[in-house]
A protein has these predicted regions:
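Soluble extracytoplasmic regions of secretory-pathway and membrane proteins
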Residues: 2-498
């Protein structure tokens, strides 16, 4: 009988098999993790380093061959001294070193001046920019209250409640000149996705933050591209395959003036080194129904889009501006002239744009504000107002103290202009999250506090208080007294830190 020939697993075959295994692992990782193929993407560097380590480890392991029923080691004649081994070892070291150096050279430690100049600040006047308008445009709810209304609305819809849930987006937007929150529905679970994927998500919820009217908007054609879908319809995968080099920031759910749902996908831009100085470079609008995407420069973004820059990004950029004036070391040790934002923010609607409001306080003395800033979420335009007064937390405590016998809790305040006086306005909620009263607190003097069961009652009481304290503008008060209905204060888009 002819003796069976032994099949040796040669070095070339081992390398070929190694390449195939690595490519398969890389494809699986890419499909699941969806890293942007961009030199500025830290996740891509980690991915490449991981692959290099895997290749090196597999190559360095002892190789074997299978011959019949016996296993014999293959002699690679000094494998660990080969050029391939040395190259792979060097590759791992070089990638790791490049990532470390790139991270260091991108940090505020070395680039404090560049970070401090990322945001341009314009000084302005409060009464000039913040006009007074009617109450019907003032939101009376915060996000948590909107969530309660959304859940109640969903619970009343028998035909949908068993298949869908309310997503937790609740994006704050201006819709036809009114402050509203919008959020899509989502599949209750994976099984519900399989049974409903053909039709898609049939509706979204819209809540008027001024009137508290909650509406389920049914769509003629369902949404098929969302973060709640799977496989090719999973929103992030859909975007990644269309834009493989784009690094997306937070994705926001909005509707255009016709009520069509879109995903506003801001594209990160790194301005300092490889990984530092993040702002926004472009905006991709993805139609949630059709999946059609359009790519815009930030300055060309359609006017109906309200959020290009997230509030957190704008706050971080201002903190760089306020703390790094005299370098990084001063921001940690001496802290001379260091200013920082307070621990909350809110949204104001001005000229159909949404602006982020937050107070500004000294790092060394954070019990009062030295001013506040407004930051445009669509353009990053930033205005600073030098107004000393109470921080928001103090105003909230004062308002709660006014009704301490009832145990109500204040929402994060809105900033209003009443009789040329900067004023904190907030809702007072009971333990179940329902709004029971409203409060106004003077920014300059947080001991001046007015409450009321309605906004009109609260405002009337507040006007009386500031006038009795010799504050406010007589001219503005006379204008207000001629109105027989709603009072006049600045249109604000209510929000709390998400």
């Amino acid at each position: 009988m002819k003796k069976k020939q032994k099949q040796h697993f040669t070095g070339k075959k081992w390398i070929a098999a190694l390449v195939v295994v690595v490519l398969i692992l890389a494809a699986i990782y890419y499909y699941i993790a969806l890293p942007a193929i961009n030199i500025h993407n830290p996740e891509l560097w980690k991915f490449v380093l991981f692959l290099a380590v895997i290749i090196f480890a597999l190559y360095a392991l002892p190789k074997t061959t299978f011959t019949g029923d016996r296993r014999h080691p293959v002699n690679f004649s000094g494998n660990y001294k080969t050029k391939t081994f040395k190259f792979l070892a060097s590759l791992v070291v070089v990638i790791a070193a490049a990532y470390f150096v790139g991270t260091l050279l991108s940090s505020p430690v070395i680039n404090a001046s560049k970070y401090q100049k990322l945001m341009k600040i314009e000084k302005s006047e409060f009464t000039k920019d913040i006009d007074q308008i009617s109450y019907d445009q003032i939101p009376l709810l915060d996000k948590s209250s909107a969530e309660i209304l959304g859940e109640r609305k969903m619970g009343s819809l028998v035909d949908l409640a068993s298949q869908f849930e309310v997503a937790d987006e609740y994006s704050q937007i201006n819709y036809k000149n009114n402050p509203v929150r919008v959020t899509p529905l989502r599949y209750a679970d994976l099984v519900k996705w399989f049974t409903n994927k053909k039709a898609g998500i049939p509706a979204y919820i819209k809540i008027d933050m001024a009137t508290q009217q909650t509406e389920l908007v049914r769509l003629k054609e369902g949404m098929k591209y969302t973060p709640y879908d799977h496989f090719g319809r999973y929103l992030y995968r859909h975007l990644r395959f269309k834009y493989p080099t784009y690094m997306f920031d937070d994705i926001n759910f909005e509707i255009n003036e016709e009520g069509t749902p879109y995903w506003v996908c801001s594209v990160k831009k790194y301005n300092i080194g490889l990984f530092g100085g993040q702002t926004i470079g472009r905006v991709v609008l993805c139609n949630a129904i059709t999946g059609e995407c359009k790519d815009y420069k930030v300055e060309d973004t359609p006017k109906w889009v309200d959020r290009v820059y997230s509030a957190d990004m704008l706050v971080n950029l201002y903190n760089y501006y306020g703390t790094l004036k005299h370098g990084f070391i001063n921001s940690i040790l001496g802290q001379k002239d260091c200013l920082t934002t307070t621990n909350g923010y809110n949204y104001l609607a001005i000229n159909d744009d949404v602006w982020v409001y937050t107070g500004v306080t000294s790092i060394t003395s954070d019990q009062s504000n030295v001013g506040f800033v407004l930051m445009n979420q669509r353009t990053m335009e930033t205005k600073y107002y030098e107004i000393e007064g109470a921080i928001e937390d103090s105003a909230m405590t004062s308002a709660e103290g006014k009704v301490q016998n009832l145990g109500y809790k204040a929402t994060f305040p809105l900033l209003l202009n009443i009789d040329a006086e900067p004023t904190y306005f907030m809702a007072l909620k009971d333990a179940s999250g329902l709004v029971k009263k409203y409060a106004m607190v003077n920014v300059h003097n947080y001991q001046i506090v007015a409450t009321g069961d309605t906004v009109n009652d609260c405002e009337a009481s507040y006007r009386s208080l500031i006038q009795s304290n010799g504050m406010g503008s007589d001219e503005e008060s006379k204008k207000a007294s001629t109105k027989t209905t709603a009072g006049t204060i600045k249109k604000i888009a209510q929000a709390v830190i998400d």
